[in-house]
Amino acid sequence: LIVTGCAAQIDPMGFSKMSEVDFVLGNSEKMRPEIWSNLASGAPVESERVQVDDIMSISETASHLIDGFGTRSRAYVQIQNGCDHRCTFCTIPFGRGNSRSVPAGVVVEQIKRLVQKGYNEIVLTGVDLTSWGADLPTHPKLGNLITRILRLVPDLNRLRISSIDSIEVDEEFLDAIATERRLMPHFHLSLQHGDDLILKRMKRRHLREDAILFCEQVRKLRPEVTFGADIIAGFPTESDEHFENSIKLVEECGLTWLHIFPYSKRDGTPAARMPQIDGRIIKSRAELLRSLGKKVRSKHLKEQIGRKHKVLMESSVLGRTEQFAEVLFSSPKQ
């Protein structure tokens, strides 16, 4: 039994104490082909049961050069890993390390290969996607990469962006939203909360007004755009008034897709030392936000009835609109 991933990176000794665990591999070590080759061949792996290096010392990220995804029509391309920010509730930087970007040329070549294999949509992914390029020569921005991909891969039908931090979105990114129809009009925002005091205690870099203005700005550029968001319920010190501001933010930003996280204390984080909210209250608030999420999603979907949409088929009966809404067909499509 081999344990790897962020939990193993953060607490390797905890897993090594489990008698059923044979090896513990860090996030860097799991990318070493020789380890897996030795396991597959039955050859002995290095003597140490725990092989976890200092993730903060890693300065490069290995791009996931995947040539196919079975019968899927959508492919995911990792362009960035790690995070340089230190939100008070989060342990991701200690599991993934500092922000590291895949060079633009490598990204473009991977996308070209996937398009040649018939993939119609590419999704750019990363831990902190909008920080892409900060560690590369000349410090290019994400908007530059988007523009380059769309220019150099003309046969790509759809380019989709995964979760972004709106405060880091650059002008070239905004220009692409306004002018490039192949850039899909759906953006998932890392908002986390709707109250300024809680945002400061989270050590986020934006305020609620920043989020509202960003959504308004993008809607002016691309009226058909939709937004999703991550929101945490029950962060330490969150009062009823603070929570109500998260509820209001859903309407003020016009969000249609909500990803709700009940706050979960992570040992060693600053938030873990703050006054905690009762678990029953956290659960109740998360349920309220999820209920609101279902309501706004249903409203958006009902508004699409009778409208024409371009749909990318994922199977003979299932597809997605450009805004990522799911479409079910009553009979199989070729």
Question: PLM features: residue spans?
Answer:
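Proteins enriched for Cys/Gly/acidic motifs involved in redox and nucleic-acid/cofactor modification
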Residues: 1-132, 147, 172, 187, ...
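Residue-level signal for inorganic ion chemistry
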Residues: 6, 33, 124, 161, ...
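Conserved SAM/AdoMet-binding glycine-rich loop
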Residues: 10, 116-240
